[in-house]
A protein has these predicted regions:
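Glycine-centered low-complexity coil/loop motifs and glycine-rich tracts
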Residues: 11-36, 49-64, 78-94, 107-120, ...
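Extracellular beta-strand/loop-rich repeat segments of large surface/secreted proteins
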Residues: 115-118, 128, 133-228
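Compositionally biased amphipathic helical and low-complexity segments enriched in hydrophobic
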Residues: 4, 25, 32, 42-44, ...
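Structural motif
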Residues: 5, 31, 43, 70, ...
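Serine/threonine-rich low-complexity intrinsically disordered regions
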Residues: 11, 25, 32, 58, ...
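The right-handed parallel beta-helix/beta-solenoid scaffold, focusing on the short coil/turn
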Residues: 1, 8, 12, 22, ...
Length: 229
């Protein structure tokens, strides 16, 4: 499923996909299975409260491979690449992606799970290898997932960007390219304090896209990340 929002106002939430199971077992109890895979929410304009690549409301369901593209909308609360919203969820929210190019949003979750569900292997991309984050874009805290297990959660920083904070990522990758980088500014600026729960041994920098040739007596310096406060 794919939902594209280009304008107007949605006073609740926009969903790429929703999973509910209204079937009953032999004893008349609601079944608790049902997965959400490969759904997409594209936000190009308008105003919404929350956005979900997929919302899985079954207890044992999984959210996998769902995507959100934020490309100009205003999101008053949060974005969830893949979410398990059953209070006692036992499934996993894994392999979901949120791409941020422009617009405004509160917090961002690659994966989200209530109950015992896991939120691993999710990705958030700031910009792309060809497109910078637009000036004026506002983003709160970006979470790989809402759980303490951060295995394979990845934040890709492809452009200069300012966000509130980042949390619950195992991998942090900076891709530096002439077309998307202004070296006069920090690549990633945090505005609400020092980040936490990052494994700095997993920091990766790809500078193969920089073609600048500094003078022999000048160092070419790029400040990867700073804390505005």
């Amino acid at each position: 499923n794919t939902l594209k929002v280009t304008g107007g106002t949605i006073n609740t939430a926009a969903y790429g996909g929703v999973v509910e199971n209204n079937k009953l077992d032999a004893h008349g109890n609601p079944l608790q299975t049902g997965d959400a895979k490969n759904n997409k929410l594209i936000l190009e304009g308008g105003n919404i409260q929350n956005g979900y690549g997929a919302d899985v409301r079954t207890q044992a369901g999984n959210a996998t491979g769902n995507v959100i593209d934020l490309k100009g909308a205003t999101v008053s609360d949060s974005l969830y690449g893949g979410a398990l919203t059953h209070a006692a969820a036992t499934g996993n929210a894994t392999g979901n992606t949120v791409n941020i190019l422009s617009g405004s949003v509160g917090d961002v979750y690659g994966g989200f799970a209530n109950g015992n569900g896991k939120t691993t292997g999710n990705t958030v991309n700031l910009g792309t290898e060809t497109d910078a984050v637009a000036a004026g874009t506002t983003v709160g805290t970006i979470y790989g997932g809402n759980k303490a297990d951060v295995t394979d959660n990845t934040l890709n920083v492809n452009t200069n960007a300012t966000v509130g904070n980042i949390a619950n990522f195992q991998n942090l990758k900076f891709t530096l390219k002439d077309s998307t980088l202004n070296p006069a500014n920090s690549v990633l600026r945090l505005t609400t304090g020092a980040t936490n729960n990052l494994d700095w041994t997993k920091l990766e920098v790809d500078a193969t896209g920089l073609t600048v040739t500094p003078k022999s007596y000048e160092a070419y310096r790029v400040n990867l990340m700073d804390n505005a406060n």
